[in-house]
Amino acid sequence: MNVLRDTAKPAREHFDDVEAAQVTEGLAESAFAMRQDWDGKPWNPPAREQPGVYAWGEAHLQYAYSLQFEATGNRRYLDVLVSRFRQLLALRDDRSGRLDEVRGRVMPAWGSVRFSTRPPFEGKSTCWAVHAGMILYPAARFVRMVQADPAICRRYAGPVAEFRQAIMETLAAYEENWHENVPQSGGDTEGYYTEPMAGPDPLPLNQMNTLGRVMLELAVADGDIQYRKRVENLARFTKRRMHVNGRNALEWDYRPGLSPPFDS
């Protein structure tokens, strides 16, 4: 169904067309379809048994609902977001006692085996930080948007408290993977995340900063100083690894290291 053919329609109306035609009550299993992965194949094991994969499907859809509310002010989009995020919370590993086989403990996050492809962790369930960040982001936006709007803050007070607590629990679970570093050249402290599956080097910038943008939303919503400092440290880490290329444009490596050169 090519709903984008009618270019006279605003983008927000295109979303409603897609929603009516394709969105179901079940969670979106990929960015391209409500069911199956991005190759059109069933997840093995099923997505509900490795819910980290919803980071690349349902998380995008819930983000779209948050954007639709910003664009229209229609509370229906928030109601749907609340309902769908609660489905994700019910699948969090600690709700079922699912073990993170890499960390050796149960995490308040969403594990998967799909991306565990390298020995010695091949086929092991683990809760990737990037998946947690992707899944939490729409809920963090929800908390920030509701608290900024006196007209709706009372209506959604319950979900705001519920989601904030859940977000904080998940963020805290990755605290052991947070590191701070003072550059050899001097300057303010920077920070980065690692992942047991990926070794001691800093995670790719896009992966670690999914957690950063979640913390940024809560810092704006609640004025949390610790989250703000964490975001600033992540931003310094990223900024110091940017360089100007031959076309006078900023450029950065996907996964830069701790020490220069950063323009490999």
Map each language-model feature to its residues.
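Conserved aromatic-histidine-acidic binding/catalytic patches
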Residues: E49-V53, F69, G73-R76, G123-C127, ...
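Well-ordered alpha-helical scaffold segments within catalytic/enzyme domains
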Residues: M1-D17, A59-R75, M134-Y156, T210-I225
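Eukaryote-skewed repeat-based solenoidal scaffolds used as protein-protein interaction platforms
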Residues: A139-E251, L258, F262
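Substrate-binding cleft of extracellular glycoside hydrolase catalytic domains
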Residues: R98-A132, F142-P159
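Aromatic- and histidine-enriched alpha-helix N-cap/loop-to-helix transition segments
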Residues: E49-A64, R76, S83, T126-P138, ...
